């Protein structure tokens, strides 16, 4: 637990820009981040209502710049502040190849091709704190990222925070509903 940063380049090779030297602000940017928080929270299985009720916010934690060969071996993020339940990485437009991201949880893995449309668009990846993730090496160019802690600022009365188990319950419910629908409709659509 805490803000300590690992410096072993066999594990992690990336430039970290001191937050005191960076300003990321403006109404448009704040609205963009709020929109990404809402969308990524929904994709993590958190309802839009709970995003508001729990006061889910993104707090800027790091500014990272990956050069050719830059990578981060599989790891889990540590809790960096009270209420933190996940991480949001917003990739700013920059030209690079490689640097795919793998996110794994309980034996399942998803690979994200981060260099697709990287020169002209923002991309983001969000994941719960109990997910293992890695950044594969940049093969050419530079990858520029803002790393945010996903934080609950208004915990519910039970002190329960969002976690991947909520998403698992949602998937299980959807699977049960799909199976029921297939049984009653003989698999027909329409």
Feature-to-residue mapping (PLM):
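Intrinsically disordered, low-complexity boundary segments flanking structured domains
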Residues: 42-53, 77, 89-90, 134-135, ...
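Alpha-helical interaction elements in eukaryotic regulators
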Residues: 32-36, 40, 84, 131, ...
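Eukaryotic intrinsically disordered, low-complexity regulatory regions
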Residues: 153-190
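Signature of the catalytic double-stranded beta-helix
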Residues: 2-70, 76-79
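Catalytic core of non-heme Fe(II) oxygenases with the double-stranded beta-helix
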Residues: 56-59, 63-159
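Intrinsically disordered, low-complexity regions
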Residues: 3, 14, 135, 168-171, ...
């Amino acid at each position: 637990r805490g803000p300590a940063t690992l410096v072993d380049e066999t594990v992690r090779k990336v430039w970290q820009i001191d937050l005191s030297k960076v300003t990321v602000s403006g109404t448009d940017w704040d609205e963009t981040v709020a929109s990404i928080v809402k969308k990524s929270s929904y994709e993590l299985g958190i309802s839009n209502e709970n995003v508001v009720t729990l006061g889910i916010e993104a707090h800027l934690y790091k500014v990272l710049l990956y050069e050719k060969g830059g990578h981060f071996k599989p790891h889990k993020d540590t809790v960096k502040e009270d209420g933190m339940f996940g991480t949001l990485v917003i990739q700013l437009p920059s030209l690079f190849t490689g640097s795919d991201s793998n996110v794994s949880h309980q034996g399942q893995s998803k690979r994200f091709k981060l260099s697709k449309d990287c020169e002209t668009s923002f991309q983001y990846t969000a994941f719960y704190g109990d997910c293992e993730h890695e950044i594969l090496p940049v093969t050419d160019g530079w990858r520029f990222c803002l790393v945010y802690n996903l934080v609950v600022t208004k915990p519910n009365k039970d002190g329960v925070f969002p976690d991947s188990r909520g998403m698992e319950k949602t998937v299980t419910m959807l699977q049960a509903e799909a199976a029921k629908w297939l049984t009653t409709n003989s698999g027909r659509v329409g």
